[in-house]
């Protein structure tokens, strides 16, 4: 494919990077990323992936824009309150970059729908706000051999890890099962600083871009944590592979997708390793 003059100007800051260049930008334009959740994490990830020229971006979310979302979900505006989040997100992404094809899925992602959703995408971003969804995404991606980025946010903290099939532990290797209902506070209960979604969601977009380009080191085998109050990042090395993992281990016991009881959340952290 040949770039138009407008594309050469639009992506010029990418093209001059030796890690990207013309070849890398073509990879981005020919790639596809699915974002599950158009909230605090999915919003900044979607904006940066659209700006980067990722050719096809899917976005799945069943919710509508609420006024309380606007403190952190920067893809939506006051005029969008009451509108389906996927439609609001699509409009914002297409306004940034007309090169991008945005596919919308206004649906709850569950064991019946997720495999069809993820099958045609190169990389998955978990921007969900509850543990049942996070474990479902992990299990589906492991079974479908799809790479994905996990993240969670709460108060002034965030965490991030990346799974690539055959290259490191999955989410269940680290956190075997969802916590009991009400054992971990939600953002609705405990709060979240709005910019935290921007920090962590942007890092998820970066992981997707690096994976597509095949450059740099991904967070495979590591959990990255961030504390905004102390301005500390910690990169925690995880077990390379847990042979007894119930989903990706040598003898998996989870061979079908599970719909756990849903608890209302809006950004979650699990097992912050003593933080």
For each feature predicted by the language model, list its residue ranges.
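Adenine nucleotide-associated cytosolic modules
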Residues: 1-275
């Amino acid at each position: 494919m040949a770039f138009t003059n407008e594309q050469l100007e639009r992506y010029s800051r990418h093209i001059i990077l030796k890690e990207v260049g013309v070849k890398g930008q073509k990879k981005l334009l020919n790639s596809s990323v699915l974002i599950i959740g158009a909230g605090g994490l999915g919003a900044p990830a979607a904006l940066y992936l659209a700006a980067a020229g990722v050719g096809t971006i899917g976005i799945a979310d069943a919710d509508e824009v609420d006024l309380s979302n606007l403190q952190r979900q920067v893809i939506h505006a006051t005029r969008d309150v009451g509108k389906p989040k996927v439609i609001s997100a699509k409009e914002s992404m297409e306004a940034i970059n007309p090169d991008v094809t945005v596919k919308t899925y206004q649906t709850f992602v569950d064991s019946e729908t997720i495999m069809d959703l993820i099958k045609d995408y190169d990389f998955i971003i978990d921007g969900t706000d509850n543990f049942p969804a996070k474990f479902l995404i992990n299990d589906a991606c492991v079974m479908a051999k799809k790479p994905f980025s996990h993240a969670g946010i709460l108060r002034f903290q965030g965490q991030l890890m990346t799974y690539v099939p055959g290259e490191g532990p999955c989410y269940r290797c680290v956190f075997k099962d969802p916590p009991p209902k009400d054992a971990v506070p939600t953002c609705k209960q405990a709060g979240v600083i709005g910019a935290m979604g921007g920090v962590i969601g942007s890092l998820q977009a970066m992981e997707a871009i690096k994976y597509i380009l095949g450059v740099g080191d991904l967070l495979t085998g590591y959990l990255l944590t961030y504390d905004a109050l102390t301005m500390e990042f910690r990169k925690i090395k995880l077990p390379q592979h847990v042979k007894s993992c119930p989903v990706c281990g040598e003898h998996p016991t989870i061979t079908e997708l599970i719909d756990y009881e849903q608890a209302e959340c809006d950004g979650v952290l699990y097992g912050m390793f003593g933080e």
